């Protein structure tokens, strides 16, 4: 039986109570003893019902008493009274007399109360007021104790809750620690899996190479086995014949005195000797085979690693072709063999030779009237892209066809196209045909090939040039026709700019240039002013299909009544150090000087930064423009100015070939982002006699066409850049020679405006300015006038291309036409050819403009004019206030690469758009990141440049930072709004995939970038920021604008992995993850000079 619970109130205010369990044996006395305090006096239990109070006797059974109340038991309240029961008082009073009761009431009642209240001696008599005061004090003490008790209960409750929380937190910490350990274990497993994956790929490559080698050796062994079997059969036959001879049965001959005679003995001796030779040869071949096998096993590890790297670069280069065409807007289909491979701005550039890709060309045929001793004196140099350009005979109707490789998969159309020409000019001597000591310093095989420019529709065969068609003065220029053609223009964000290559004129050969290349980070697409009318042959067969020859000199063919073709018909390539003119060339001599020009000898000259080495640094080659033979017949022939400050007769006979052994060849570093130091060349310090002899040979050599927007080349038609001369004067590494400064005359109304660059707004046509010394003393460099002219229009009425323009040339009838890609003027109809001017005494002082030469049709030997910087009598001053001014974007690109922080801070306010790329999509931020200049990167990012600018292959600055394993730069770019999921075009790899595994910092950089990829859309409560605007294409997609904060609800699902489900405001839908970033993009700063 369950006991009842009796609630007993210990005071009248019903705040203090206790609960007593009641059993059938429980009496009222038990309840009182349970409830009263220890040591307390007499107490009794009273029940109150509806305001009536009745004491309960001590011997009363409480269980039965409660059952008597029944359902009304809840109305009854039991109180513990701290006094004797009234029933006992009444019984005691009945036995006493009335007096005794009166006396008791007077005396004893206070005593009882005193005893009840704990007052000690009952003999002490207290008045009623004292008793009331005492009761009030005790009541106050009771209330204080009750409050203390409540506070202690609350404290106990709080401690219990805290204890429960601590236990709960301890358990959660244990769970979290277990989860962390599990995550670390999984990360370690993931790292092991990635490492194993790399090992598996490496093993696959090794196994493939080994299996191929084993198959090759097995085939060789089978051949040797067959040869041995054939030899054994032959031995058996010979042995049988010998036995027959011994027995005397062969041809009826009998042995005479034991000796064999007659033709049989001679045949037997010959066969025996042949057998001995064959056995010896077989043994030698077996020993060589064994040695080769041992060498192969010895080098397998090295070859495997090299093959892996080569395959990666090959895939990267193969993937660049599509982007190259896209950047240049070329829509004609090209085979994989026909496009120039280009390495991105980051990562080493390695070319691997492979046979059978291009036809093998024979050694160049010596021109009919040229004497090139050095070509025959040395073998072909084995550069990575070794190939020979054939030399065609002058004025011949047939050409030598190059030898084709067996099994070559395409024919060489170059010679076939050349046969159709009426008059074919002599081809330039190929660089690779020169010996190793004679190579003109251009590392042909180690230069990243440039992007082909936007040109006309390519013919079916790569690089073929159809025969030129006549073009009258009123015909439409090539660029104007090209603008109306079907080829797409390059995008505005990545304008493809063209540069003129150096072209030899009719009957001339190029002057090889400097071997001291300053490594340029950006390969520049070429665009020659004078294209070849006959197609050149292609490089020989140990170059890769994706990597054509990186230095191609195209001939200029003068055909009567014909017009040179557009220079963009074929793969025009130049040296990677496109800032500098790396070789010289001769101009087309006037009509009446053709024999002398044809007999002039090609001389390999060591040049520095595109300038020829001249005697005492006093003069430079004359800037004669190329003259088209048939188009210049009606104009007076100019007199080629003398190269010397003395009168020199023109050499009619062929000059002796120069000794090319002094020309050095500097290797190019693998990384396209680093600049190679300049090595001093002994040729620079040649004696005056050697230089004088060289100067005589170069008397009629024209000034080579320059690349545009270069620190060392002119930016317009005004000749060499003044900065180049200052740079070379103050920097001994830059050549230490003095060149001839050229000044422009005041522009005529034919020239359209004064532009600092001939790009018509397309800045930095060259990519980078190399080795810019920002602190050198220079003269003010204001803008120079530049004509806006058609780049490839070769008709006569147009300004002179990138050459010195004298006052006499400004009144010509020019027909300028604009081209946004390549503004290089073409051949002018000039009555006079401007003459060069000797170099000024110092770079900063005012120069005297050049004095023009009078028109002349007599040989240059009769010329008495000297080039001087002195003002001649009766000469007018030209070039009033004209100075050279650099392209600000070109300076910004170069300064960000070189780490010139002060120059970056100054020049960035002059740049219209600091995020504007060059022709390969390289921005200043790319250069600063690749060079590791953290302070410049931070400045550019704070300035608000486009952090997600992509180059022609889709490489963003984040890709560059990842390829350098720079965690600091990666973090800086990500926090500035870099797109973590941006991928390249060729290999579709994000920045996390570009970390260099073999270099330092790979683990930290890879972990950071992969971590950001995994945390995007998870951390920051799932908020990611839009980096571009996007308009929804389907109903389930979400439109957003740049800077919107999107909440990623689901990173991937069954149907989509590249699209995430996100919420923007009250709308939800799919968003492409590669347009999202962990941080918003920094807005461009207000353009101010403050």
UniProtKB/Swiss-Prot annotation:
* Protein name listed in UniProt: Apoptosis-stimulating of p53 protein 1
Q: What is its main location?
A: cytoplasm
What's in the domain note?
The ankyrin repeats and the SH3 domain are required for specific interactions with TP53.
Q: Does the keyword Nucleus apply?
A: yes
Residue ranges annotated as compositionally biased, kind Pro residues, are 525-538, 774-785, 849-858
Tell me which family the UniProt entry assigns to this protein: Belongs to the ASPP family.
- Which Cys pairs does UniProt list as disulfide-bonded? none
Q: Which organism is it from?
A: Homo sapiens
